[in-house]
């Protein structure tokens, strides 16, 4: 098992970024230390403006502040890019879907949101990943509750940031972020014991949530196959998180931002199914919010071979790709289509939709791949 406290790993990640960014980072490679990243938040970019002989100093400070912000955003996108790379390398279906969509719509492809799963215990829950996004200017928005699945989630709105010219995916408009957590204290004592066994054995792992996702490694040791099966019997979400950790659970294509005829989710669903892509059928392929403004669908998750600590190798669920169309709000229906902005469309998430999309990694849906 690779340790995220390894100085070699930190050095490798640090060296993977452009030299223009490395100078902005304060990095310590001693065991157990954190990589300190430049912040986008206003609190770390404030400049004191003075007059007279200090004017040149103020000008230099402004220049440095602007440069730091650009470097920070570039670094942030690079980390998202590493998360995306791990995700696409492990999951052939999302990679195929992106290629299929681009074969028809080769212009800018935007992500609506990125999603992650966590264990809500001992600091390993939503906050462990949220801190990475909050440091870069994201804003916490609404809480969603899923009592039947014993889950809760928070979504985060992105800061205003300039997309890379012509950039797609993580280099396009910054996506929303959706982070969920298992309410561990509501699970059976047996399930709680398994989860605590791994999270408590790695008490500092929660500090490296973003790094774990970017490197594609767990922050705890590989579990026993019997423990995975035990969790799966009570919560398939719990079992998924035990073996996938902070891996990107899914990315979501912003359907209405596509430029071709695929910019309507029903047409996109039909196109993908005709190409042999299996879509999550739980609650119907198309999930629609009560107000009709948020329409979503998703593929069935891919499976990968996983070798457990006891030497047993099994197929486990991995990740999937989602699609979201956000309709124009009623009060903006009279605005010309060419003038419609994202702020004119339905924002946020819907519990009923998300509840069914969670099941993209569940066995009932996975079995449809071979059905």
From Swiss-Prot:
Superkingdom of origin organism: Eukaryota
Organelle targeting peptide span: 1-50
Catalysed reactions listed for this entry: 2-oxoadipate + O2 = (R)-2-hydroxyglutarate + CO2
Subcellular location(s) per record: Plastid, Chloroplast
Names of the cofactor(s): Fe(2+)
Annotated knockout phenotype: Delayed germination, compromised development, cholortic phenotype with impaired growth, due to lysine accumulation.
CDD domains: VOC_like
Pathway(s) of this molecule: Amino-acid degradation
GO molecular function, one term: metal ion binding
UniProt KW rRNA processing keyword: no
GO CC terms, sorted: chloroplast
Presence of keyword Nucleotide-binding: no
Record-listed Fe(2+) binding positions: 113, 250, 322
Primary localisation category: plastid
Membrane-spanning parts: none
Keywords, sorted A to Z: Chloroplast, Dioxygenase, Iron, Metal-binding, Oxidoreductase, Plastid, Transit peptide
PANTHER family linked to this entry: 2-OXOADIPATE DIOXYGENASE_DECARBOXYLASE, CHLOROPLASTIC, DUF1338 DOMAIN-CONTAINING PROTEIN
Entry similarity comment: Belongs to the 2-oxoadipate dioxygenase/decarboxylase family.
Known role: Catalyzes the decarboxylation and hydroxylation of 2-oxoadipate (2OA) to form D-2-hydroxyglutarate (D-2-HGA). Is involved in a D-lysine catabolic pathway.
Protein name in the entry: 2-oxoadipate dioxygenase/decarboxylase, chloroplastic
Originating species: Arabidopsis thaliana
């Amino acid at each position: 098992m690779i340790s995220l406290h390894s100085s070699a790993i930190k050095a490798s990640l640090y060296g993977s970024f452009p030299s223009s960014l490395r100078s902005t980072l304060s990095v310590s490679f001693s065991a157990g230390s954190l990589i300190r990243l430049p912040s986008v938040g206003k609190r770390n970019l404030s400049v004191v403006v003075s007059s007279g002989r200090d004017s040149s100093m103020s000008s230099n400070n402004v220049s440095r502040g602007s440069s730091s912000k650009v470097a920070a955003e570039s670094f942030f996108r690079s980390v998202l890019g590493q998360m995306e790379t791990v995700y696409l390398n492990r999951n052939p279906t999302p990679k195929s879907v992106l290629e299929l969509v681009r074969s028809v719509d080769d212009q800018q492809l935007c992500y609506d949101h990125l999603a992650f799963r966590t264990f809500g215990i001992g600091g390993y829950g939503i906050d462990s990943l949220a801190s990475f996004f909050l440091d870069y200017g994201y804003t916490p928005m609404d809480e969603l509750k899923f009592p039947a699945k014993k889950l809760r989630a928070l979504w985060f709105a992105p800061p205003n940031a300039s997309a890379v010219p012509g950039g797609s995916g993580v280099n396009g408009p910054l996506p929303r972020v959706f982070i969920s957590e298992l309410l561990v204290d509501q699970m059976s004592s047996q399930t709680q014991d398994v989860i605590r066994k791994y999270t408590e054995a790695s008490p500092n792992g929660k500090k490296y949530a973003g790094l774990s996702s970017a490197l594609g490694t767990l922050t705890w040791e590989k579990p026993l196959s019997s423990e995975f099966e035990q969790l799966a019997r009570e919560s398939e979400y719990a079992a998924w998180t035990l073996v996938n950790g902070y891996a990107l659970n899914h990315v979501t294509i912003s359907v209405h931002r596509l430029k071709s005829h695929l910019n309507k989710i029903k047409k996109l669903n039909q196109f993908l199914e005709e190409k042999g892509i299996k879509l999550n059928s739980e609650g119907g392929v198309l999930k629609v919010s009560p107000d009709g403004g948020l329409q979503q669908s998703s593929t069935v998750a891919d499976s990968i071979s996983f070798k457990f600590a006891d030497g047993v190798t099994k197929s486990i669920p991995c990740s999937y790709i989602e699609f979201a169309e956000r309709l124009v709000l009623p009060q903006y229906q009279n605005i010309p289509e060419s003038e419609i902005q994202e702020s004119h469309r339905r924002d946020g998430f819907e519990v009923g939709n998300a509840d069914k999309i969670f099941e993209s990694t569940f066995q009932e849906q996975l079995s449809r791949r071979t059905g």
